A protein has these predicted regions:
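Ser/Thr-glycine-rich phosphate-binding loops at phosphate-binding pockets of nucleotides
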Residues: 84, 88-89
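Cys-dependent protein tyrosine phosphatase-like superfamily
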Residues: 1-79, 92-181
Length: 181
């Protein structure tokens, strides 16, 4: 992703750039499922929902580093984003806003703005790089599913947090280890 679409940063910002890599191999998992099943939007949406859970569960070290950066900024602005700024950035925004006690419906509304602000081409560009084998069959339905956000995707992450950790605050303090800071 970074090599394909590098950020256009000033030298000052390039010195301060930090890469925190997160991936759920979403498109690859869709392609593999399509080999065993039919091209199915409902299934692809389930893959997206699972990806949002994987962002939280498989990358706790990245989230810990992310929050250390936010905490250490001491009031200075921090810019965080992913290639399309909808899935991984959506999870990051959900975590930050939840810790700041932003109302859930406001978090949801902000998240859903991705559908209005991104073209589907921008939204899927990040996923194309996850394919390990160029002969995999990526369908238009996969790409259209990847190019949109649905509240069910974010809700899958929220439900995981509520069921497994009770709250974002508990995830932050106990799972990410900020209760000792």
């Amino acid at each position: 992703e970074i090599k394909k679409s590098p950020d256009n940063l000033s030298p000052f910002l390039k010195e301060r750039y930090i890469n925190l890599s997160i991936s759920a191999q979403t498109l690859s998992r869709m392609v593999n499922a399509c080999k065993d099943n039919k091209d199915d939007a409902i299934y692809y949406e389930k893959v997206m929902e699972e990806s949002y859970k994987l962002y939280l569960e498989n990358h706790k070290n990245v989230w810990k580093d992310f929050f250390k950066i936010l905490i250490s900024s001491k009031g200075h602005p921090i810019l965080f984003h992913c290639t399309a700024g909808k899935d991984r950035t959506g999870i990051a925004s959900y975590l930050v806003q939840s810790l700041c006690d932003v109302e859930e419906n406001s978090i949801d509304e902000s998240y859903l703005l991705s559908n209005d602000l991104l073209s589907s081409k921008e939204a899927v560009s990040e996923q194309q790089d996850t394919l390990k084998n160029p002969d995999k069959n990526v369908t238009p339905l996969m790409l259209s599913t990847l190019g949109r956000v649905k509240i069910s995707y974010l809700n899958s992450a929220k439900n995981l947090v509520k069921e497994k950790y009770q709250s974002v605050k508990s995830y932050f303090l106990n799972e990410l280890g900020f209760n000792n800071h």
